[in-house]
Amino acid sequence: INDFIKNNYPSISKGQMLDFKYPQNFKGWDDKYEQLLQYEGFARALISTRKNHINLDLENKFINDSNIPLYTIWGDSDSAVVYNNFKNKLNKLMPRRIEYFISNSGHLPNMENSVEFEDILYNKILKEN
C-alpha cells in the first residue's frame, strides 16, 4: 500500500482532470479528489478496484437477452473509456442497446453537458419506460 501511495498519489488527482473534454471548466475538481486521498483505506480501495477488475461479458449478454431496456451513454470525447475500442464488443454482446452520445463531453458527460444528458435521460429513456 505504501508503494502504491508513493508511486501514484503525487499525480493521481491531476490525472482526474483528463476525464474531462474541457478540464478548465472544472477548476478545483482535482482538489476535491485530493481530499479523498486523506482517508484511511482509500488506497486499499483503489488497489482492490484495479486487482479485481473482472470481465462482465456474461452479465452483459444476460442483460441483452432479457426484457430489460438497455441503453449506453457516452461522452463524444471520452478518453478514459474510448468508444471505438469497445464498439465491436458492444455490438456482439449488446446488439439491441440504444446508444446516446453526449456532445462536448469526455468521461463524465452528466457533468460536462448536463442539459443534453438530462434531456436524453428524462425525455427519452425514462419516458420510454
Regions flagged by a language model, labelled:
Residues W29, N84-F86, E112-S114:
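Short aromatic-enriched loop/helix-cap "lid" or pocket-rim segments at secondary-structure transitions
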Residues D30, E34, W74, S105:
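Conserved short-loop catalytic and cofactor-binding motifs
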Residues P95-N129:
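Catalytic active-site module of serine/aspartate enzymes centered on a nucleophile-bearing elbow/loop
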Residues L37, G41, V81, E112:
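Residue-level signal for the nucleotide or nucleotide-sugar donor/cofactor binding architecture
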Residues L18-K21, S79-Y83, E116-F117, L121:
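A general structural signal for short secondary-structure boundary/capping elements
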